[in-house]
A protein has these predicted regions:
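Active-site loop immediately N-terminal to the catalytic Tyr-X3-Lys motif
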Residues: 81-87
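Active-site-adjacent segment of SDR/Rossmann-fold oxidoreductases
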Residues: 81, 102-113
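Rossmann-fold cofactor-recognition segment
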Residues: 1-5
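Residue(s) in the substrate-gating loop at a strand-loop-helix junction
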Residues: 76
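Conserved mid-core segment of classical short-chain dehydrogenase/reductases
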Residues: 26-42, 85
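Active-site helix of classical SDR
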Residues: 56, 92
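C-terminal helical subdomain
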Residues: 116, 132-169
Length: 184
């Protein structure tokens, strides 16, 4: 995902252009390290925004020329509002979510559908060691099933677990003066 020079050769080497392409990238790094080390912060930004957006942009052009296809971008609820505990990762995911929204708008009348997936916490290597609430945490297979259903039903934006829609609506609507006092 970081080797953008390899994107076009990779796509050119495919035996056929797929009907569905899914971008699933998640690299959070350590927020404290991201704050002090520009190289580390750049890695988080490039991994979660620049690389996935670049690949999907190239695929979008090819799907548009063909007149069909579905692009799926797995973003994050962390992009719904910047928080002190993960704002480098969250800002990259916010950018990716906005990119997917704009791409969806651009391709809406071109036969190409774009799906944004907001899974919330997922039991993966990235979240290993974190104390996550079970009701808010999905298994990778659950995310995969949700992606498949979203593609089949032509959804635009999905939260893998519906509770995240409510949680993030509340978090987005907390006034900034109060939000700054919270430790989330």
């Amino acid at each position: 995902v970081l080797d953008s020079d390899g994107f076009v050769p990779f796509l050119d080497g495919l035996p056929a252009l797929p009907q569905v392409a899914v971008s699933v990238v998640g690299y959070m790094g350590d927020q404290a390290e991201n704050e002090q080390d520009l190289t580390q912060a750049s890695l988080v930004l490039r991994s979660n925004f620049e690389g996935p957006a670049g690949m999907l942009a190239l695929l979008a052009n090819r799907f548009e020329a063909r007149g069909s296809g579905t692009l799926v971008g797995v973003s994050s609820v962390a992009g719904d509002r910047g928080r002190a505990t993960n704002y480098v990762y969250g800002s990259a995911k916010a950018g990716f979510t906005a990119f997917l929204s704009g791409l969806r708008n651009r391709l809406a009348k071109k036969g190409v559908h774009v799906v944004t997936v907001l899974p919330g916490f997922v039991n993966t290597a990235m979240t290993e060691g974190l104390d996550l609430p079970a009701k808010l945490t999905a298994e990778p297979e659950e995310v995969g099933t949700a992606v498949l259903k979203a593609v089949q039903k032509g959804r635009n934006v999905i939260y893998v677990r519906g509770i995240w829609r409510l949680v993030m609506a509340i978090i987005r609507n907390i006034p900034e003066a109060i939000f700054k006092k919270l430790s989330i």
